[in-house]
Amino acid sequence: MSKSENLYSAARELIPGGVNSPVRAFTGVGGTPLFIEKADGAYLYDVDGKAYIDYVGSWGPMVLGHNHPAIRNAVIEAAERGLSFGAPTEMEVKMAELVTNLVPTMDMVRMVNSGTEATMSAIRLARGFTGRDKIIKFEGCYHGHADCLLVKAGSGALTLGQPNSPGVPADFAKHTLTCTYNNLASVRAAFEQYPQEIACIIVEPVAGNMNCVPPLPEFLPGLRALCDEFGALLIIDEVMTGFRVALAGAQDYYGVVPDLTCLGKIIGGGMPVGAFGGRRDVMDALAPTGPVYQAGTLSGNPIAMAAGFACLNEVAQPGIHETLDELTTRLAEGLLEAAEEANIPLVVNHVGGMFGIFFTDAESVTCYQDVMACDVERFKRFFHLMLEEGVYLAPSAFEAGFMSVAHSMDDINNTIDAARRVFATL
């Protein structure tokens, strides 16, 4: 047995499923998950000594690549002064100033510890500010594991929420309305059915949890207009897209102004950090200045703030996003060319430093139904064959891939060459 197999066997006796987040268990592709020894730049190194070109990037945070010296040094320096104080620090102020400067729609920001905390807090704030209970989310969009967001979409344009996980009471989920991503008619139908009851829409501007599905040109502006028409708030979940699709996020890339924004992943530089913020009048409703309660023992802790501050200062340097786009575009085009040579039907979506690989005969993939029609079994085979080639993709047909500026054009070309060999055997 390999070291990964031995560790996985031991882990399953001690940790549910052997992992601390389900997708890591390779349930979406089968087999034994890799246990990682270290990472540097664009590469992961497993406990058996094999190197992989990494397109998971810790599920998005590693936009600069692994073990970036500026972030590493900032963490070491901060740790020498203490790990946690439970009191305000200067770095929290500097971090808040940096975030609000980089994302102009955020007048104020509150730091938390995860993307889930950011989205659940933003929704509570929207409900408290509007005095309404219902929310709209979209089929295939994931916003963390808060109870009100673990809702399965049924057939049709509009579905009253049904819990997607045991342990979520139906009474919690009933206020969550599920609409179809990239379908404004389904959203209008929800508002017309509940015109005075919907507090907010929460949306991934690029749906990154049904692989990678960008918005149609009219979709995000249409959501803004509907929120304005019916008095609801628009929450854009930029946990994946923030500082990756563009410096000011997908909201800037697509030209839409939210009332609230949720951030995570890149904002922590690899440390556990989330944030939410937006309009000053809305944020003023948050405790201690307002009645909507939110708190966290480790929120704004000095290590995470130091890592995030260092990361965002690097990400803000000229040319970063142009490099991400160039590398991702080359990868997407190369994969399509290699698939065409092998007569493999393939769609590759990409935006900035995000991409999605779909085995499908369809011309395009624009919604949850398109994603579910893709050939998952072929993806599983593709994943494992690419792993043998030393390329680590997301171990699920429903998760986006992530590029970093640490990837070289040689890494991209080597990945395309590996895919060409794999396509020939599929």
Curated annotation (Swiss-Prot):
UniProt keyword terms in alphabetical order: Cytoplasm, Isomerase, Porphyrin biosynthesis, Pyridoxal phosphate
InterPro entries registered for this protein in UniProt: 4pyrrol_synth_GluAld_NH2Trfase, Aminotrans_3, Aminotrans_3_PPA_site, PyrdxlP-dep_Trfase, PyrdxlP-dep_Trfase_major, PyrdxlP-dep_Trfase_small
Pathways per UniProt: Porphyrin-containing compound metabolism; protoporphyrin-IX biosynthesis; 5-aminolevulinate from L-glutamyl-tRNA(Glu): step 2/2
Recorded GO CC terms: cytoplasm
Annotated PROSITE patterns: AA_TRANSFER_CLASS_3
CDD domains per the UniProt record, alphabetical: OAT_like
Location, primary (coarse class): cytoplasm
Keyword set includes Glycoprotein: no
BP GO annotations: protoporphyrinogen IX biosynthetic process
Molecular function as annotated in GO: glutamate-1-semialdehyde 2,1-aminomutase activity; pyridoxal phosphate binding; transaminase activity
Assembly and binders: Homodimer.
Family: Belongs to the class-III pyridoxal-phosphate-dependent aminotransferase family. HemL subfamily.
Protein's name according to its UniProt entry: Glutamate-1-semialdehyde 2,1-aminomutase
Gene: hemL
